[in-house]
Regions:
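Active-site-adjacent bridging/hinge elements
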Residues: 34-42, 64, 100-102, 128-135, ...
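Short acidic-hydrophobic surface loop/beta-edge motif
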Residues: 200-207, 244-249, 343-347, 417, ...
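Feature 926 captures the class I aminoacyl-tRNA synthetase adenylation module centered on the KMSKS loop
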Residues: 201, 394-449, 453, 498-541, ...
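N-terminal, positively charged nucleic-acid-binding surface of large information/translation enzymes
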Residues: 1-234, 258, 275-288, 292-307, ...
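Structured ligand/cofactor/substrate-binding pocket environments in proteins
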Residues: 54-66, 73, 82-83, 151-154, ...
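Short Cys/His-rich metal-coordination motifs, predominantly Zn2+-binding knuckles/fingers
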Residues: 181, 251, 348, 419-422, ...
Length: 874
């Protein structure tokens, strides 16, 4: 039975059911040991919620690569998985509980973790459904979760080994503290915003003197923990006060006045209060001079006992109350309004508090040095684009120790125990044998600690004999955004080199962020976020995937433009209709076969040569990850060369009496269309499968079909030049018909003026195509032209000529054009007058002014066209 495609392209119908069919057939399952391996691990999405448009972009690029490699004959593994995302996921669950009036402390650790597991299962199912809707060819038999038993073993192994090497240690330092989540944050979990604030200048009275020191601060609430006052030893204004004391106006404490060259002579009054427990620079000074380091805040950002009557207040409430009291007491010298950079928690968005705390840290310098050295070897990771390697190396060269402990309950517990009697610390892969005498550290590890092991922990490490590890590690390509080069890419690199001795991936493709049409970052606050599932419902996954890949260059941001989705849908509809045309013309026993090149006509040879050029270009750009070039090449070939030209030209043979020419055209149509859908498959998996199944094909599914290869027999160095004559003549006839309003139903005669002796045979060969497409007949070469001759320059400086006197009344047509020019001159004069009149431009509604501007532009455009037309007629 002859296969057909429905009259209308319906993306919902086309995409329905295919993904499950592919899964049932296990097309995505890796493990064919006869093939060369190629592996990608998915950047595991957080189980915090649904996937967003950025995830769709990132995973579509990976799917395009993996489908391409699978079709090229690789044993292509795309390993899926998800991240437990400790702090972020716990924050989501706590927010849900708060809506029910429940806090995590009401539930306790065990029950809260149970609730988070429920959340994880709920959103893991949602994420898998979204992956399916996007058409991602993931090998689910190898799916991993960062909290899986095997991955948790790897986390403990890494922690213990680093600890035993002295690269993990406990220390009391100033860290970034999130008072909402009540946990430490690493530096890169803090984002900075420029916000308006104040610089407060307060009077400190010198003990035993009437003199006053004016000291500036942006955080008056920390004054209760001040331990000293510092000036510069070379500052003549304050030398006499060194060794004396000044009274802290917040609590009456007498603070020693000390000198240190660290003090910035140009900042404020060049007198600095020292608050060791609430400022990293003050902390260093306090260590240098052995000062006490008390804290005046609790972990939730409220004031503690040191704050006296302000105890229990939120830190910012305390600031306002203290300021009010200072103003009443005459402590305030003056206040400046400033704009300064303030750190915020990436998760809770709370203002981060520099806070003295005992935490676990990774000593980063040796690990970073190893990663940088590895980049100088053959085992280097290649960054695409290259400029991001500089981003990586700059960060690694200036890296600080990594705070890895988090005061939350969802995450990998730190494998450290404290003896209940002696306080002795034990770190190990397993709990102590007499575990009842020990208490495990309450903290969990930073989510990125386990994520950093993802490329090798998912492959069975620390068992380096695991078949997965031996076959698929290092992985080939990582695809990720530039926003997590520090968070994730860098950490995977140094951990992989430390624990496997090899790079985690051979290359990393870096992309940007998706922004809205105005270039703004998508966010909940702006309400400009886009759910990719909604886009798929409206336009289809193939349209979304094409848009994402055809509008992205490595390393660059992308703008989401809804109108482009509609254009993409129209493009797929064009492909659909071209397939229907082919199917309508072939018999049910039509085969996909190699073509007999000697029997092919000019159009057949041209489209096959162009197809070779496209395959070469697509291969080159796929290998360079230049997906926008892939899309551009395919679009031009399909829309222009195949649909607009070749299909139209094929009608000459399909409707003619020459059976051999008809068979040649049909075979070429089938061959080219089959190749097109295979080239499209990595980008448009659903519609390519639908068309592939309808037309003659070789494999059970396009998923496992062979990637198109160049056929050298179809290369033709001269065919494009020859075909250009045909295109130019057809375009020339169409242009003359349009300019002089000659209906397509009227057959026109044309001549060609040329100085090329060898052109006549070619022009005779293409004449039937010209006749078929534009109803025009060639009546001679290098013949005299009439005074009413219209010309169009074609390839090689030759000219196409049509005697207009045969088809139109030239004088009447000229008169019409001259009349139109006069009318347009009047409209232009009127429009220019209105728009130069301030009474109109300042008083009329803006919309009306813009409308007049648009009209004037239109009149000018029409005027220029009419003048050009008259010039040609003359």
């Amino acid at each position: 039975m002859k296969k057909e495609l429905p009259t209308k392209y319906d993306h919902l119908a086309v995409e329905k059911g295919k993904y499950q069919q592919w899964l049932d057939k296990e097309y995505f399952k890796a493990g064919d040991l006869t093939k060369k391996p190629y592996s990608i691990v998915i950047p595991p999405p957080n189980v915090t919620g649904k996937l967003h448009l950025g995830h769709a972009w990132d995973t579509t690029m990976q799917d395009m690569i993996i489908r391409y490699k699978r079709m090229q004959g690789y044993d292509a593994l795309w390993l899926p998985g998800m991240d437990h995302a400790g702090l972020a996921t716990q924050a989501k669950v706590e927010a849900r509980l708060r809506e029910q009036g429940i806090s995590r402390y009401d539930l306790g650790r065990e029950k809260l973790v149970d609730k988070i597991w429920e959340w994880k299962e709920e959103y893991a199912d949602i994420i898998r459904a979204q992956w399916a809707k996007l058409g991602l060819s993931l090998d689910y038999s190898k799916e991993r979760f960062t909290f899986d038993e095997g991955l948790s073993d790897a986390v403990r192994e890494v922690f213990v080994r680093l600890y035993e090497k002295g690269l993990i240690y406990q220390g009391e330092k100033i860290i970034n503290w999130d008072p909402v989540q009540r946990t430490a944050l690493s530096n890169i979990e803090v984002y900075h915003e420029d916000i308006e604030g104040h610089m407060y200048y307060f009077n400190y009275h010198i003990v035993g003197s009437d003199d006053i020191l004016v000291i500036a601060t942006t955080r008056p609430e920390t004054m209760f923990a001040d331990q000293a006052i510092f000036v510069h030893p070379d500052d003549e204004r304050y030398k006499k006060y060194v060794g004396m004391k000044a009274i802290n106006p917040a609590n009456g404490d007498e603070l020693p006045i000390m000198a240190d060259s660290y003090i910035d002579l140009d900042f404020g009054t060049a007198v600095m209060k020292c608050t060791p427990a609430h400022d990293p620079n003050d902390f260093q000074l306090a260590k240098k001079y052995n000062l006490p380091m008390p804290k005046c805040m609790n972990e939730d950002g409220t004031m503690n006992d040191l704050a006296g009557k302000y105890k229990g207040m939120d830190r910012f409430e305390c600031r306002e109350a203290l300021l009010k009291d200072f103003e009443a007491a005459g402590v305030v010298d003056h206040i400046e309004t400033i704009v300064h950079s303030v750190g915020h928690s990436e998760r809770s968005h709370a203002i981060v508090e520099p806070y003295l705390s005992k935490q676990w840290f990774v000593k980063m310098k040796p690990l970073a040095e190893n990663a940088l050295k590895n980049q100088e070897t053959d085992d280097r990771v290649d960054f695409v684009p290259e400029r991001f390697e500089k981003t990586f190396s700059n960060w690694m060269n200036n890296i600080e120790d990594w705070c890895i402990s988090r005061q939350v309950w969802w995450g990998h517990r730190i494998p450290a125990w404290y003896n209940n009697e002696t306080g002795e610390l034990y770190v190990g892969r397993e709990a102590p044998k007499d575990v009842e005498n020990w208490t495990q550290d309450e903290d969990v590890l930073d989510t990125w600690f386990s994520s950093a092991l993802w490329p090798f922990s998912t492959m069975g490490w620390p068992n380096t004999e695991d078949p997965m590890f031996k076959r698929y590690f290092p992985t080939d390509t990582l695809v990720t955004g530039y926003d997590i080069i520090f968070f994730w890419v860098s950490r995977m690199m140094f951990q992989s080199i430390e624990f496997t001795g090899r790079r985690p991936f051979k290359n990393v493709l870096i992309h940007g962020l998706i922004r809205d049409e105005q270039g703004r970052k998508m966010s909940k606050s702006l309400g400009n976020g886009v759910d990719p599932m909604d886009v798929i419902d409206e336009y289809g996954a193939d349209s979304l995937r094409w848009f994402l890949l055809n509008n992205s260059s490595p390393g660059a941001d992308m703008r989401y433009v809804p109108a482009k989705l509609k254009s993409t849908w129209n493009f797929i509809n064009k492909i659909w209709n071209s397939a229907r045309y082919v199917l309508m013309n072939i018999d049910e026993d039509q085969k996909l076969e190699e073509l007999d090149y000697a029997t092919l006509n000019l159009a057949d040879k041209w489209i096959l040569n162009r197809l070779n050029e496209v395959i070469r270009s697509v291969d080159e750009n796929m290998d360079k990850f230049e997906f926008i070039n892939v899309g551009t090449e395919l679009y031009r070939f399909i829309w222009d060369d195949f649909c607009s030209w070749y299909i139209e030209l094929s009608k000459l043979h399909l409707t003619g009496d020459d059976e051999a020419a008809k068979k040649s055209a049909l075979n070429t149509l089938v061959y080219v269309l089959n190749t097109i859908v295979r080239l499209l498959h990595p980008i448009m998996p659903f519609v390519s499968e639908e068309i592939y199944q309808a037309i003659p094909h070789k494999e059970e599914s396009i998923v496992i079909s062979k990637w198109p290869e160049v056929n050298p027999e179809y290369d033709n160095d001269t065919i494009n030049d020859q075909f250009a004559y045909l295109i130019d003549i057809i375009k020339g006839v169409r242009e003359i018909r349009h300019t002089y309003v000659i209906k397509n139903s009227i057959e026109v005669d044309y001549t060609i003026t040329t100085k090329q002796d060898d052109l006549e045979a070619l022009l005779k060969e293409i004449a039937p195509y010209v006749s078929k497409l534009v109803n025009a007949t060639c009546v001679g070469y290098n013949v005299p032209t009439s005074k009413n001759n219209a010309t169009e320059v074609i390839k090689g400086g030759n000219t196409l000529n049509i005697d207009l006197g045969q088809y139109i009344d030239m004088e009447a047509e000229k008169a019409k054009v001259e009349k139109e020019i006069k009318k347009l001159e009047g409209e232009i004069k009127r429009g220019e007058g209105m728009l130069s009149n301030p009474n109109f431009t300042s008083k009329a509604p803006a919309a009306k002014v813009e409308a007049e501007k648009a009209k004037l532009e239109d009149y000018r455009s029409k005027y220029a066209a009419a003048k050009e037309k008259l010039s040609k007629m003359n």
